């Protein structure tokens, strides 16, 4: 793949799910599986469900903590079955299709994080990610099986990659450092602006960070915006 995307599982409970995810990854051309948790999750059941994707399990990387699993990544995407709304600006998700439309523009190492089967990702884990994705499902039963959720998201990314096989990206995507500097400049600008009420400043910072991460801006655009916040 042109872009490096890791699938990250946080404390998975069922070996069968891990094996099924390995199979799905191979179906759609993804190679790196990262697991936060114990190596014992990969057992005979996992290999049985993986079928011909054993090498994905053999090469899986294990981490003790969430922070370690995402530490070397440039862009991290959280997944959640619980949707945010207009009143919850920290949890405004995009759909897998919207993610696929954007993700091929990203340069660097990307991680897509999937939470625990029973209660998903914790809020503090989601807050450490750059983007939140949620799969539209029926309100009667919105939470999907873990391996099915992985399949939906990887399918959308793969089909978009196929449709855009010869896509040429002319502008360099803003690096992680570019974005962090832009956000820091904006935060400093907000802190110094006496016209903005104190109780709204933190909200402005949260919204701007989300906008920057959702927009996939170029390096040139990031530096142009920075000049406005001096």
UniProtKB/Swiss-Prot annotation:
Any GO BP: tRNA nucleoside ribose methylation
Chief place where the protein resides: cytoplasm
Catalytic activity: cytidine(32) in tRNA + S-adenosyl-L-methionine = 2'-O-methylcytidine(32) in tRNA + S-adenosyl-L-homocysteine + H(+)
EC numbers for this chain: 2.1.1.-
GO cellular component: a single term: cytosol
Subcellular location: Cytoplasm
Protein name: tRNA (cytidine-2'-O-)-methyltransferase TrmJ
Organism: Methanocaldococcus jannaschii (strain ATCC 43067 / DSM 2661 / JAL-1 / JCM 10045 / NBRC 100440) (Methanococcus jannaschii)
Lineage: Archaea, Methanobacteriati, Methanobacteriota, Methanomada group, Methanococci
């Amino acid at each position: 793949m042109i872009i490096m995307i890791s699938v990250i599982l946080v404390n998975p409970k069922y070996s069968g799910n891990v094996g099924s995810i390995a199979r799905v990854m191979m179906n759609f051309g993804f190679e790196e599986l990262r697991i936060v948790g114990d190596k014992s999750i990969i057992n005979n059941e996992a290999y049985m469900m993986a079928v011909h994707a054993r090498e994905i399990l053999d090469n899986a990387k294990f981490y003790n903590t969430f922070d370690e699993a995402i530490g070397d990544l440039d862009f991290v995407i959280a997944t959640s079955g619980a949707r945010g709304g207009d009143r919850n600006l920290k949890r405004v998700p995009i759909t897998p299709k919207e993610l696929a439309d954007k993700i091929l523009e990203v340069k660097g190492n990307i991680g897509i994080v999937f939470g625990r089967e029973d209660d998903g990702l914790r809020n503090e884990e989601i807050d450490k990610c750059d983007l939140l994705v949620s799969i539209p499902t029926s309100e009667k039963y919105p939470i999907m099986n873990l391996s099915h959720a992985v399949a939906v998201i990887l399918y959308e990314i793969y089909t978009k990659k196929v449709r855009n096989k010869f896509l040429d990206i002319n502008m360099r995507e803003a690096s992680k450092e570019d974005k962090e500097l832009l956000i820091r400049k904006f935060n400093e600008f907000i802190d110094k602006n006496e016209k903005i009420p104190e109780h709204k400043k933190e909200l402005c910072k949260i919204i701007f960070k989300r906008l920057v991460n959702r927009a996939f801006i170029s390096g040139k655009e990031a530096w142009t915006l920075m000049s406005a916040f001096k």
